[in-house]
UniProtKB/Swiss-Prot annotation:
Species, as recorded: Danio rerio
Membrane-related topology note: Peripheral membrane protein
Keywords per UniProt: Coiled coil, Cytoplasm, Endosome, Membrane, Protein transport, Transport
Localization (cell): Cytoplasm, Cytosol; Late endosome membrane; Midbody
Ranges for region Disordered: 1-22, 180-220
Gene label: chmp4b
Coiled coil region boundaries: 21-88, 123-181
PANTHER family linked: CHARGED MULTIVESICULAR BODY PROTEIN, CHARGED MULTIVESICULAR BODY PROTEIN 4C
The keyword Cytoplasm is annotated on this UniProt entry: yes
Protein known as: Charged multivesicular body protein 4b
Length: 220
């Protein structure tokens, strides 16, 4: 198949258009073919240059013919370089377009799937379901609280009466301790010796003071 056949296809106007993947693959094959053509022309140019140098002094006519062929090969090589640049640009643009198409397509699939998932959902039913869940959680908590409370098995007592009885017991214990302390503490013994008498000098001074007071009263 010719280069143009590979690039543009061999189908007629009514032929089916190629898919992006097929077009990208064809462009890559064309790039590979042109790259091989480049390598071939570069070798031919080197060969013609060697021939021209070899015959430069011996056979001028052969040298000129080699240079002419070299020029033609260089022209073809330049054309292929330009074509490769164009094909690379086209392939990259097509790959980007294909990527964007796939992304949009997948996003569309996801949107449809989400819509289908929500079609069977009613917001009122969802709210009702959540309310039921909350009520069941509250009921479960109440049951847990009831189970965790200590059970008296029918024995019920007045807590105030129990506290009053406890205070009486504490007071009785306190009084008992005080009595025990009083019985255990010994009283001081009565001194066996007489207390020292008041000094005589001091008693005489007091008597003199009394006499002075009596005389002063009589003088009045």
């Amino acid at each position: 198949m010719s280069l143009f056949g590979k690039m543009f296809g061999s189908g007629g106007k009514g032929g089916k258009s190629a898919s992006p993947q097929e077009a990208i693959q064809r462009l890559r094959e064309t790039e590979e073919m042109l790259t091989k053509k480049q390598e071939f022309l570069e070798k031919k140019i080197e060969q013609e240059l060697v021939t021209a140098k070899k015959n430069g002094t011996k056979n001028k006519r052969a040298a000129l013919q080699a240079l002419k062929r070299k020029k033609r090969y260089e022209k073809q090589l330049a054309q292929i370089d330009g074509t490769l640049s164009t094909i690379e640009f086209q392939r990259e643009a097509l790959e980007n377009a294909h990527t964007n198409t796939e992304v949009i397509k997948n996003m569309g699939y996801a949107a449809k799937a989400m819509k289908a998932a929500h079609d069977n959902m009613d917001i009122d039913k969802v709210d009702e379901l959540m309310q039921d869940i909350i009520e069941q959680q509250e009921l479960a908590q109440e049951i847990s609280d009831a189970i965790s409370k200590p059970v008296g098995f029918g024995e019920e007592f007045d807590e105030d009466e129990l506290l009053a009885e406890l205070e009486e017991l504490e007071q009785e214990e306190l009084d008992k301790n005080l009595l025990e302390i009083g019985d255990n503490v010994p009283l001081p013994n009565v001194p066996s010796t007489s207390l020292p008498s008041r000094p005589a000098k001091k008693k005489e001074e007091e008597d003199e003071d009394d006499m002075k007071d009596l005389e002063a009263w009589a003088a009045n």
